[in-house]
Regions:
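Conserved G/P- and acidic residue-centered "switch" motifs that form tight phosphate/ATP-binding loops
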Residues: 84
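Residues forming the Rossmann-fold NAD(P)(H) cofactor-binding site
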Residues: 87
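Conserved active-site tyrosine of GNAT-family acetyltransferases
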Residues: 125, 130
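Short glycine/proline-centered loop/turn elements that form peptide/ligand docking sites
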Residues: 116-121, 135-145
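A short, internal acetyl-CoA/4′-phosphopantetheine-binding micro-motif in the GNAT/acyltransferase core
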Residues: 74-81, 111-113
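Conserved GNAT acetyl-CoA-binding A-motif
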Residues: 97-117
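Short hydrophobic/aromatic beta-strand or adjacent loop that forms the aromatic wall/cage
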Residues: 44, 144-148
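Acetyl-CoA-dependent GNAT
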Residues: 8-72, 77, 90-91, 96, ...
């Protein structure tokens, strides 16, 4: 088995494969989200996890300012969830951010606490040091509640 590699998305084919991963997760990504994701994959920094030529997952980030970096999108192929790929991508993004002077990582996720698919998403971020700082209901442009999480990045 080939070791997993994480690198910056550069190939058009990788964008297509990232979008397919998201399409295969309809409980997390709706059509409006997929359209926004397609735009962001082409315009923002995206890291892809690759093994043996296969895209396993991706994370897209965008600077909010000189100190804060936001995770816009993150997904791992459905059949590979829970195997540490998301954690590795997150650690990669954190190191990338620290090397560029970012001090805070921000992520927004569904704030609808009755919607079960996002329970695992919220738990994922919380177990990796993210702290809920706000519930915005409704979140502008989403039409639904959003939870905002932050994580302070420690420099070595």
């Amino acid at each position: 088995m080939n070791p997993m590699d994480i690198h910056t998305l550069t190939k058009r084919d990788e964008i297509r494969r990232c979008l397919q991963i998201a399409r295969d997760l309809p409980g997390w990504f709706n059509e409006a989200g997929l359209r926004a994701m397609e735009r962001d994959l082409g315009e923002e920094r995206t890291f892809v996890a690759i093994e043996g030529g296969d895209v396993l997952g991706f994370v897209t980030v965008k600077p909010l300012n000189e100190r804060a970096l936001e995770i816009l999108w993150m997904a791992v192929r459905r059949e590979l969830r829970g195997k540490g790929i998301g954690t590795e991508m997150l650690l990669f993004a954190e190191e990338w951010a620290k090397e560029r002077g970012f001090e805070v990582l921000v992520v927004k996720t569904s704030g609808d606490l009755s919607y079960e698919p996002y329970d695992a998403t919220r738990r994922f971020y919380e177990l990796r040091g993210f702290v809920r700082i706000a519930l915005i209901d409704p979140y502008p442009g989403w039409g639904e509640p959003a939870l905002v999480y932050v994580k302070c990045l420690k420099r070595k």
